[in-house]
Amino acid sequence: LTQDATGTMAYLEFEAMGVPRVKTERSVAYIDHNTLQNGFMNMDDHRFIGSVAKKHGIYFSRPGNGICHQVHLERFGVPGKTLIGSDSHTPTGGGIGMIAIGAGGMDVAVAMGGGTYYITCPKVVKVNLTGKLSPWVAAKDVILEVLRRLSVKGGVGKVIEYCGEGVKTLSVPERATITNMGAELGATSSIFPSDEITLSFLKAQGREDVWTPLAADPDAVYDEEVDINLSELVPMAACPHSPDNVKPCTELEGMKIDQVCIGSCTNSSLLDMLKVAHILKGKTVHPDVQLSIAPGSKQVLNMLAENGALATMIDAGARILESACGPCIGMGQSPNSKGISLRTFNRN
């Protein structure tokens, strides 16, 4: 997996190897980061990446098609497979049962050329989930709780494995939200089992043929264990200037905000968007607040249009952005001077 912020250098390195076609089962080049054309450079990069994809047997996802991790989950994620990507949030794929790792462009180029990707053998941390999320508590609160306990350095050199009865209460998009932000833990990767919920997601995508059940061995030994009762979690938010500076929303209630941005590879699934539409229905965005919403993929955008949720968002006064990374990587929607921005993104 590559994207256009890191892909240009990765493909220059790949072409320098002189390999005629990629030797991976599948390689995908996504254009989702630098999608605002303020000058010729971004478009030149997109044209270059597209030409490399055509020449070397790489799938090409054009601008506006969606955020790489959301689209990859929908179209290409396969339980039990390995994935490396030139993007730190590649572990999103762990939500579908992949070992997905963010890597450098050179490492990804070497892998596409048939070379080996080496990592130091990671420690494995078991996160045992019990109970069920209460109303208004989301999957984001699960990973925020992990960050609160372990810190942004707590996952370095480790793979986070989610287990327990609570796993069965989480959909694939919710699991992907949690594994996505394993990057903020500094983890090598994060992974969920592949079960009937995974199969249901793949059936909805018309890809049930790639499903395989995967779970931890009953006698598996872990380097660390963390227990989280989902029923005890409350709505939380990460405050400036670190994802592990987590506080319950009750401590933030009443704070005046200037901007709300919803989307990114962490929270742009159909499930996330339908929650937003439900909250906005029959309401109007406050005149002093700017609300921007970026669906994670064309698939999500089309489904929102079909079920009326998109109209609900527009009627409420939301600005609908392109299906891309957008404000998360600073591509537009900068807040006002000394403004307070509330975002569903994985970085703050």
Predicted regions, residues:
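Fe-S-dependent hydro-lyases/dehydratases of central metabolism
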Residues: 1-348
